[in-house]
Amino acid sequence: MNISANCLFSGSSLASEVHAAAVNGDKSTLLKLIAGNSELKDKEDQFGRTPLMYCVLADRVDCAEALLKAGADVNRADRSRRTALHLAAQKGNYRFMKLLLARRGNWMQKDLEGMTPLHLTTRHKSPKCLALLLKHMAPGEVDTQDRNKQTALHWSAYYNNPEHVKLLIKHDSNIGIPDIEGKIPLHWAANNKDPSAIHTVKCILEAAPTESLLNWQDYEGRTPLHFAVADGNVAVVDVLTSYEGCNVTSYDNLFRTPLHWAALLGHAQIVHLLLERNKFGTIPSDSQGATPLHYAAQSNFAETVEVFLKHPSVKDDSDLEGRTSFMWAAGKGSDNVIRTMLDLKLDIDINMTDKYAGTALHAAALSGHVSTVKLLLERNAQVDALDVMKHTPLFRACEMGHKEVIQTLIKGGARVDLVDQDGHSPLHWAALGGNADVCQILIENKINPNVQDYAGRTPLQCAAYGGYINCMVVLLENNADPNIQDKEGRTALHWLCNNGYLDAIKLLLGFDAFPNHMENSEERYTPLDYALLGEHHEVIQFMLEHGALSIAAIQDIAAFKIQAVYKGYKVRKAFQERKNLLMKHEQLRKDAAAKKREEESKRKEASLQKGMQNMEQNKFQVQLSTAVREKTASTLQLSNKQTDLQNKRPLSVSASQIQLGRNSRGSPKACRSKGSPKESCLSSELQSEGHNIRQELLRKHIKSKPSCVHFHCGKVKEVTKVEAKHQVAAATELNGEKHKEHAVEANGTSAHGNRRHASACGTAGAGEKTRDQSLSSSGNRGHCEGTSVVVCNVSCAGGIARNSKRCEAVPKSKRHQQKSRHKEVNYERCSPAGSSRPGSAKVVFVNTRNATVCAIEHANNVGNHELAKKTSPLLSTETESTGTGPRNPAACSALDDSLNLEKTGEVGSRSAGDQLCSVAWQSTNIELIPLEIRMQIIEKERTRKELFRKKNYAATVIQRTWRSYRLRQELSQLLSAKRQRKEDEDKWRQETAAFLIQVAWKKQLNHSPQKSVPSCKSLKSVNKTSSAIKTSKQSILKQIYGRSQEGRVYQPARPPSKLKLSDVQLVSANNLQYVNLLENVGKSKQFSYNMRPSTAAKSKSTRLEH
């Protein structure tokens, strides 16, 4: 002690020398120092201690007495508020305590912890110091409490000093004072593992053996029995439970009884003791519904469990979650308890489920106890049992990452392809826990790495959510797809950018993850948007370097493309609406024309019937006059005529045969009969009989309305009707004049004219045949697609004058003039306005005759034919065999003409008196059409051409716009290729140069608008053989609306390109903006939907500049 003191205080100040002298017991030096300076007797060191305190600590009684004689302060306190008496009581130094108490030391002084010297004296086994203090203390001062509200009796019980307890109780210390935790001295006495604590407990209980003292609960509800059981002190438990007032099943604040504590700590003897002394006979449960057996089972105390199971009052009840003690044992891996319970309780159900349908195997797998799992599988536990979440034990093991348990379960037959109620597979749970080894095991057992749950999330997305990069590496190496989107449109990259896992983002982009997937929400966020919202600056920079786009940038790009597509859509829609409107108008016009034709036909039919009645009256008058002339003739002439009639019958037969043969050869252009007239050769009886037959046939003919008009295809147009009307009018006037001349010549003709009848008719037939052929060829050259009307015409005059060659043979010059007129009409004729196909005009050739005269001649010929059939059976037989009978050509032609004109509405109504003349056939000139009607036709044609020109122009603009859009798309692909292939700059330059050369070679920079040349000017010199129009390449719209009316749109020849290959500069992407890639620069804007009006000036074509 002296050596240490010398070392401590060597080289120190004078005060330190005083303290050193006190410690060393150097009384002479101490007195010398005090004599030199009286203040040194109470000098404090760095701890606030005086030389007197050091004398107590060093047990230097002589020095202490010297200091006290020198006037040292006995109650001086140090920094911890302790005096020399505190130090003497703490050391249990009886002499110093007696010395200090004699010098009036304060025994009630409290230190910083509120302890008095009385509290400190309880630490020692000897009660002498305690007894010395109790002699100086008043009766009420013995229960002084420290800062923890503990008295000297608390400390005596804590230190297990039964003598101190007895001494304090003798001095009236209160045994029921609780401390700051609510504990009384009996709690501290019972909370001791030493068996000798039984004496302290007995001392306290002997002082007051009350029930309230035995069952006193601290602030946590624990009784002295709880503490005794917790320390495993069987003797103290035995003492406490020996009192009848002790409650063995008292609850603490956790609803645990002393029996729960004994089971939890595995005190089998205490358990047995408590079970035996339980007066209620029931096993209480804690706040979770667990019995003491649950506690013993989870702690793997097989002996304690055996004690419980063997006691008759114990049952394996379930807790509040429906778990039995067997499940608790499985969850804690208590294999010994499980074996004990399976051996002792044969009726135990190993697959019993709890409230959530979990089994003991679920609990063991969740906790990762491999041995327990093996034990349960050996005892036939169900390996794929499902709980309410549809989780098997494998799910629980994958969630917690217990690799060995997973392997054990898979070997035991667990299925890896099951999913829970959310669609999560075991791989999902392994990825959520970041267990890379478990993921590898599951993938090796053939689980799909891209399996999706009901929300569309993959295991890769689950791993990305937690940023488990090791787990992501395993999944990606096993072909996990990083671009799969869940139902909300999010990918694994969305989760990584949201949480700012830069290393995982680098890994994912290295496996070709697309950086611009948009979610399906209203905001349509991309991974870059999530990084921006989270303010992860490093992630933002990295994503931008790898081509990531925000939703705002994507919307700008999409808006540009949508606008381009929408413009095209508007053009197509407007075009379709215009087309539908035109078609609707065309249909309405056709319906109106058809209705008008129907009304005209009905009106003309009524007028025809009225005309036929007038014609029949005139016919009777003519027959009456003829009968009077025949009666005045002599009987000799009658016999001669009969003889001549018999001689001419073979000629009639032959003529009919010739006519039939001509018809069979396929040229039925006119219905002819070469037989001579029958009126002058018959008797009065035959004439009367023929008159009756003709009357009947005429009525039938009027009812049946036969027609020789042949319809090929289509319908007759309104313009054709107008031409036909004027042709009929002109032809009627000319025929009227010629009819008078033929009538004069016919009256002067004798029997010699009758002998020339055959030759004249043959000549006329040949002339008409030639004329019909020319008309048919001229019709073919016109390319008429509508209705071609061929009218049976006869050039012979009516009555006996039909034999004249002048009436039948038409001069060649006149026929040539007629052909030229037809050609002129055909070529100058345009399709009607509103027609859907150009060149669809219908050409109609009309030949008219006097309807009244033709009808009379037809009735006479029919009657004569009936008489001929009776007189000549051979003729009738041959005629019936061929299916056609010889008819009077003039009558047939005139009647057919009149019926055709009435049916088609092409001949105007005329009075019966104006149509009594029959003349040779003549074509109608277009000059005969009134000027007003011609102007209407021309105006309609102009309107139709203008409409077609607009359609053609719209189609051209749409095609040009589409081609320019394709060029812009190729250019954008080249620009994006540059950003993606920075390392291959030369290859990109080559592709760019090739693209520019292609544009300069194939596309024309200086465009002029296409103008169609009118066909009316270009077709004046077209001949018959070259009238067919060659079809050109048409656009889709031209194919829909047909070719142009002229048949061909003449396009100006494309000038040779002014650009040369040497002029093309291999420029970078920044110079591409100076290249004019659009065909229709400045022209597409002239359309109705574009930016400027069509009257704006045309933009000049741009050239490539170096």
From Swiss-Prot:
This is Inversin. Residues 636-645, 653-666 have a biased composition (Polar residues). GO terms for cellular component: cilium; cytoplasm; cytoskeleton. The keyword Electron transport does not apply. The gene is INVS. Pfam families: Ank, Ank_2, Ank_4, Ank_5, IQ. One of its GO terms (biological process) is Wnt signaling pathway. The D-box (destruction box) mediate the interaction with APC proteins, and may act as a recognition signal for degradation via the ubiquitin-proteasome pathway.
